[in-house]
Amino acid sequence: MAVNTYSMKKDWNKKVSAHFSVYEFACSDHSDTVLIDTELIYILEQVRAHFGKPVHINSGYRSPSYNISIGGSPRSQHCLGTAADVTIKGVDPIRIALYLASMPYFQKRGGIGYY
């Protein structure tokens, strides 16, 4: 696992994979720093390929102060750049969660929630 650090000022439109850019993972508090895990990007690309539709990132990286302000867990993986809340238009969240749960990565570690 490698977590890369990006700057919204310098890297906002930088592609981190074929279908994702830095700005999609940016914190809602408009902070400059964005942390993104390379494994997370790989997983999101697999999800996109599986469902054949774009993946929308509702929440990616969260600065610690923003995470506190929204009542997030003090140990939130979002603050480490290793988590994302996503939706796919026309796909029930439970289907996304079940697909993720079937991946070897999540059979070893990690957590999946849906709402």
Kindly give the residue locations of the regions a language model identified.
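N-terminal start-of-chain detector that recognizes signal peptides
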Residues: D29-H30, V55-Y61, P93-L100
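Amphipathic alpha-helical interface surfaces
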Residues: I36-I43, K53, Y66, T82, ...
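Catalytic cores and adjacent binding grooves of peptidoglycan-active enzymes
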Residues: R75, L80-Y115
